[in-house]
């Protein structure tokens, strides 16, 4: 945790969920109404097909609804794409950009990620900018170099704590069950904070840096208690209310 920063626990449902899954979302919202919102801010990013339903369900709770990706353009002949304006219209408050799956599967580079973040801001959304190294880069000892390059290229120079969240997601830990050590996470997050300070100045000290990569209730206290870890970007565990709430519950132990 970082003193003075309210943590954020953000779920990413990815390409999962239908209308039948919305009951899990209701349980997440209800769970935060029991006092968890005093410990942490919460967000669930859902597929575009569910976003308007999710926003309506969560509007009566402290939990926000978000989008999983957006296009760089506001509108146009981009079949199958979703603009930030569309997400905002459907009820989103945040959007994930630069997720490793998008970088790898769609060939997104840092410049595209930065353009998506700027598009999110124009629409009035908070951009969650994802960065992280692959297994090959990690084994080559290039983790910090990769993070430096991604902060430089993916984060717009006008980023502020109110419009931007950074999510460090070691690619090799996503959905694999593998988790870096607390020392590894501490080193990566401290490095990201330093690079943000060089780029953004004093505001970097208040910019939230989330950890993402096989976060679950059983390891949440250890990971989320690391200095400069200001919350979590949660994948598979966000699909089940009990798991997502269990991760958020970690902050009761950490803050207590």
From Swiss-Prot:
UniProt family annotation: Belongs to the triosephosphate isomerase family.
Naturally occurring in which organism (per UniProt): Mesorhizobium japonicum (strain LMG 29417 / CECT 9101 / MAFF 303099) (Mesorhizobium loti (strain MAFF 303099))
Full protein name: Triosephosphate isomerase
Keywords: Cytoplasm, Gluconeogenesis, Glycolysis, Isomerase
Enzyme Commission (EC) number: 5.3.1.1
Keyword Lipid metabolism attached: no
MF terms (GO), sorted A to Z: triose-phosphate isomerase activity
Subcellular location: Cytoplasm
Swiss-Prot/TrEMBL GO biological process terms: gluconeogenesis; glyceraldehyde-3-phosphate biosynthetic process; glycerol catabolic process; glycolytic process
Residue positions of the active site: 99 (electrophile), 169 (proton acceptor)
Database matches in InterPro entries: Aldolase_TIM (IPR013785), TIM_sf (IPR035990), TrioseP_Isoase_bac/euk (IPR022896), Triosephosphate_isomerase (IPR000652), Triosephosphate_isomerase_AS (IPR020861)
Cited function: Involved in the gluconeogenesis. Catalyzes stereospecifically the conversion of dihydroxyacetone phosphate (DHAP) to D-glyceraldehyde-3-phosphate (G3P).
Pathway assignment: Carbohydrate biosynthesis; gluconeogenesis; Carbohydrate degradation; glycolysis; D-glyceraldehyde 3-phosphate from glycerone phosphate: step 1/1
Subunit annotation: Homodimer.
């Amino acid at each position: 945790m970082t003193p003075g920063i309210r943590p954020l626990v953000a779920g990413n449902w990815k390409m999962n969920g239908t209308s039948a899954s919305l009951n899990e979302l209701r349980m997440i919202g209800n769970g935060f109404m029991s006092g968890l919102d005093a410990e942490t801010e919460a967000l669930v990013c859902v597929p575009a097909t569910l976003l308007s339903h999710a926003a309506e369900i969560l509007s009566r709770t402290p939990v926000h609804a978000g989008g999983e990706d957006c296009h760089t353009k506001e509108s146009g002949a981009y079949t199958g794409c979703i603009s930030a304006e569309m997400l905002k219209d459907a009820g989103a408050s945040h959007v994930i950009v630069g997720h490793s799956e998008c970088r790898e599967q769609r060939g997104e580079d840092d410049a595209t990620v930065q353009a998506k973040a700027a598009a999110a801001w124009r629409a009035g959304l908070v951009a969650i900018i994802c960065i992280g190294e692959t297994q090959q880069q990690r084994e080559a000892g290039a983790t910090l170099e990769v993070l430096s390059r991604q902060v430089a290229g993916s984060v717009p120079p006008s980023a502020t704590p109110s419009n931007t969240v950074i999510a460090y997601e070691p690619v090799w830990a996503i959905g694999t069950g593998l988790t870096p050590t607390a020392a590894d996470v501490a080193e990566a997050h401290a490095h990201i904070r330093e690079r943000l300070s060089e780029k953004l100045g004093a505001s970097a000290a208040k910019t939230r840096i989330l950890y993402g990569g096989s976060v679950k209730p059983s390891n949440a206290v250890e990971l989320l208690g690391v200095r400069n870890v200001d919350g979590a970007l949660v994948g598979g565990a966000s699909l089940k209310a009990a798991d997502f709430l269990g991760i958020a519950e970690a902050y009761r132990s950490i803050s207590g």
